[in-house]
Amino acid sequence: MINPSKLIEGAMAVYGEENFNKLYGEIIPIDSSRVIEADDNFILDFKGRKLKFIDTPGHARHHFCVWDKQTESMFTGDTFGISYRDLDKENEVYIFPSTSPVQFDPKALIKSIYKIMEYKPQRVCLTHFAAIKPTQKVIDQLIDGIHFVSNLAKKYATENDAELIIQDEMMSYLLKGIEKIGNDELEFCRDRLKLDVEINTQGLIYWQQKISSD
């Protein structure tokens, strides 16, 4: 926030410069005097209501989650993946990882997910979207998804049609997972997931390119 250049770079990689400018305009740095640097286990006390900040890299190196002990809720940002309520079926949820550019790290992400679960949250509050109960089935879905897309990237990232191949494989995987929870409205689901698949694919390819260039 003090120097938003990396944030701008990442957002432009996702949306493209033209769409970025339409959506966000100019990103103005925040004066350092207005910023609290929250290290791992930092406590923010709102007159007795304490929120604990937890370092959770994997989606991005700077990412943190926030633990609210009073409600046993973990605010997970993008670390705990993406889950849409309009894809739910009879209280069954489907969840999948966010691998958007530019700092995806699967090993760190899985470690962060287990770190979240050490708090035994009754609910995880996702940026995309809403609060869900982190059952073992949900956790397994998320971890399996990370392994699947990581292997996709390793297998296809250097192919000429890498983006299209990874998108197709990822979409098929997600639709099969959604079918397993009893949702058979696959055309609606395909449209719902299209943008996520495109953005996640960009992040996976960038991750593999970064590994190759290091």
What are these regions (language model features)?
Residues 1-57, 61-125, 129-133:
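Metallo-beta-lactamase
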Residues 5-9, 70-71, 89-91, 139-141:
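Short, glycine/charged-enriched secondary-structure capping and boundary segments
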Residues 18-29, 93-98, 185-188:
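Short glycine/proline- and acidic residue-enriched helix-loop micro-motifs
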Residues 35-38, 120-130, 198-214:
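Amphipathic, soluble alpha/beta structural segments
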Residues 36, 57-60, 195-198:
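A short catalytic or substrate-binding loop motif that flags glycine-/basic-rich loops and adjacent residues
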Residues 100-119, 124, 132-167, 171, ...:
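Internal alpha/beta domain cores that form substrate/cofactor-binding pockets in large enzymes
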Residues 151-214:
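C-terminal regulatory/interaction regions
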